[in-house]
C-alpha cells in the first residue's frame, strides 16, 4: 500500500494511515476511566479513557447515544465498544465509541469516597474544630503556583478592596507528581512562620485528576493540624475536594477567598466619614454646652469676676515687688562680700576671715528674716483677699436668691391657677378662646370650664343677661 519512493501529501499520508488502522485493527471492547468529559452544543461527547499507565482520546457521536440510559461523568469506570481511527484534520489517533456502559464507580471517585468516610469518622470535618477568622487581618499567606492566574486574581482583588494587606506567597506545584509533598511543605512553612493571620490554599479549576493533590490524606491532615485559620479556594464552585471539607472556611473561588479576608476599602472610608461626623457633632455640642454654662456663670457673678481679676493683679504686683526686693538685697550683700574679699586679699589675716564669716552669717540671717516677713505679709494679704472674695460671692448669691424668691412669689400670685384655687374658674369655647361675655357664646355650643382641680365640659342650654 505504501511506496517508499513516493512523496505523499499530508492528507494522502494520513488517509493511508487511517485506512491501514481500520483494515488491520478490528472493533474491540475496552475498559477504562472517563476523564476530561466535555459536551458542546453539537451534542457529541468528547472525553479521555484511561488506566493507570495511559489514556486515549474518545468521541461518542450524538447518533450513537440513543441506547445510553445513564449520564456519564468524570471518574466513572466504563466498558466501551470502539472503532480505532485517525482524525485526519489534526492527525490525532482516537476511538469512535459505538457502545458505552458503566462498570462501577471509578477508581479515583472510589478513593475519594473512602478517604472522605474515614476522615468523617475521625471527626476531622466537625464544626467544633473550625477556627474563626481573626477580626484584624494584616498578613495573608497564599499557597499556590507563582506562575498561575490564581495568584494574580487574588492580588487584584486585594489591591482593589484593601491594598494595605501584606501578601506572602508560598510557591508550590498544584498538580502532578510530587505536588502533594510540595503543597504540604508550603502549608507547614506558612503556618510555622508565625507571620500569617490567615492562609489561603488556592488553584484554578480542572478535572478530577488535576485536582487530585487536594484529595490526598497527607494534605488533609496538615490542614487539620495547622494553628492558622485555613481557607480552601480550589477550582470552580462545582468542584469539591477533601481539602474543602477539612479546612476552616471553604470559598467557592480564589477571588471569593480574597474577598472573605479583606474589608471593602470604600465601605471603610464611608464608615470613617460617619464616625468623624459623629465625633465632630459631639465635640461641637459639648463645646456649646460648656459655653452656655460659662455664659450663665458670667451673668450670675459679674462683680466677683472683677474682684478676682483685681486680686489676681494685686498678687502679681506683690510677687514682682518681692522678687525685686530679693534681687536688690542679694546684689547689696554681694557688693559687701566683694568689698570684704578685696580687703581680705590685701590684708589676709585669719581674724578678718572670721569677721567676714560672722558678717556673712548676720547678713544671711537678716535676708532670711526679711524674706520671711515679706512672704508672711503677702500670705496675709492673699488670705484676706480670698476671704473677702468668698464673702462677696456669698452675698451676691444670697441677693440673687432673695430676688428670685420674690419674683417667684409675684408670679405665683399673678398665676391664673392661683386664682382658680380661690374658687374662681376660666371658661373657654371650642376654639380654646376665653369667654368674657355672654355675647361670645350661643345656644348649644360647647364650653370648657377650668377649675383648680380639673375641667368641666358643658353645652349651653340657656343664656340670661344681668
Swiss-Prot record:
Keyword presence, Cytoplasm: yes
A molecular function (GO) term: nucleic acid binding
Cross-referenced InterPro entries: Exonuc_VII_L, Exonuc_VII_lsu_C, OB-fold_nuc-bd_dom
UniProt superkingdom: Bacteria
Reactions it catalyzes: Exonucleolytic cleavage in either 5'- to 3'- or 3'- to 5'-direction to yield nucleoside 5'-phosphates
EC class name: hydrolase
Protein function: Bidirectionally degrades single-stranded DNA into large acid-insoluble oligonucleotides, which are then degraded further into small acid-soluble oligonucleotides.
Protein name: Exodeoxyribonuclease 7 large subunit
Species of origin: Ruthia magnifica subsp. Calyptogena magnifica
Amino acid at each position: 500500500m505504501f511506496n517508499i519512493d513516493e512523496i505523499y501529501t499530508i492528507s494522502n499520508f494520513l488517509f493511508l494511515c487511517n485506512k491501514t488502522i481500520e483494515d488491520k485493527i478490528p472493533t474491540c471492547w475496552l475498559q477504562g476511566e472517563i476523564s476530561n468529559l466535555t459536551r458542546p452544543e453539537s451534542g457529541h461527547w468528547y472525553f479521555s479513557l484511561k488506566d493507570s499507565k495511559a489514556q486515549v482520546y474518545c468521541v461518542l457521536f450524538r447518533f450513537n447515544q440513543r441506547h445510553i440510559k445513564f449520564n456519564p461523568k468524570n471518574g466513572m469506570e466504563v466498558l466501551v465498544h470502539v472503532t480505532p481511527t485517525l482524525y485526519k484534520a489534526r492527525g490525532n489517533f482516537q476511538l469512535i465509541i459505538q457502545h458505552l456502559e458503566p462498570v462501577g464507580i471509578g477508581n479515583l471517585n472510589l478513593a475519594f469516597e473512602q478517604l472522605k468516610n474515614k476522615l468523617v469518622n475521625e471527626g476531622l470535618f466537625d464544626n467544633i474544630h473550625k477556627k474563626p477568622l481573626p477580626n484584624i487581618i494584616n498578613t495573608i499567606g497564599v499557597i499556590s503556583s507563582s506562575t498561575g492566574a490564581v495568584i494574580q486574581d487574588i492580588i487584584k482583588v486585594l489591591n482593589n478592596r484593601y491594598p494595605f494587606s501584606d501578601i506572602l506567597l508560598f510557591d508550590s506545584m498544584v498538580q502532578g507528581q510530587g505536588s502533594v509533598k510540595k503543597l504540604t511543605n508550603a502549608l507547614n512553612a506558612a503556618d510555622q512562620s508565625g507571620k500569617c493571620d490567615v492562609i489561603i490554599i488556592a488553584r484554578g479549576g480542572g478535572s478530577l485528576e488535576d485536582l487530585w493533590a487536594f484529595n490526598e490524606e497527607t494534605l488533609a491532615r496538615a490542614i487539620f493540624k495547622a494553628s492558622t485559620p485555613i481557607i480552601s479556594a480550589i477550582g470552580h464552585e462545582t468542584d469539591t475536594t477533601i481539602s474543602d471539607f477539612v479546612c476552616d472556611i471553604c470559598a467557592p473561588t480564589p477571588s471569593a477567598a480574597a474577598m472573605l479576608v479583606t474589608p471593602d476599602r470604600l465601605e471603610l472610608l464611608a464608615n470613617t466619614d460617619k464616625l468623624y461626623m459623629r465625633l465632630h457633632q459631639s465635640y461641637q455640642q459639648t463645646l456649646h454646652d460648656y459655653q452656655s454654662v460659662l455664659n450663665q456663670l458670667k451673668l450670675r457673678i459679674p462683680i466677683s469676676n472683677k474682684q478676682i481679676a483685681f486680686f489676681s493683679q494685686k498678687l502679681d504686683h506683690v510677687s514682682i515687688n518681692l522678687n525685686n526686693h530679693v534681687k536688690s538685697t542679694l546684689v547689696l550683700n554681694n557688693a559687701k562680700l566683694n568689698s570684704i574679699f578685696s580687703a581680705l586679699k590685701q590684708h589676709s589675716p585669719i581674724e578678718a576671715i572670721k569677721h567676714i564669716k560672722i558678717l556673712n552669717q548676720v547678713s544671711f540671717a537678716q535676708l532670711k528674716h526679711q524674706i520671711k516677713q515679706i512672704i508672711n505679709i503677702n500670705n496675709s494679704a492673699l488670705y484676706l483677699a480670698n476671704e473677702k472674695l468668698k464673702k462677696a460671692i456669698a452675698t451676691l448669691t444670697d441677693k440673687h436668691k432673695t430676688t428670685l424668691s420674690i419674683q417667684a412669689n409675684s408670679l405665683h400670685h399673678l398665676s391664673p391657677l392661683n386664682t382658680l384655687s380661690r374658687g374662681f374658674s376660666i371658661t373657654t369655647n371650642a376654639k380654646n378662646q376665653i369667654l368674657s361675655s355672654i355675647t361670645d357664646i350661643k345656644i348649644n355650643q360647647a364650653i370648657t370650664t377650668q377649675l383648680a382641680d380639673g375641667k368641666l365640659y358643658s353645652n349651653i342650654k340657656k343664656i340670661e343677661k344681668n
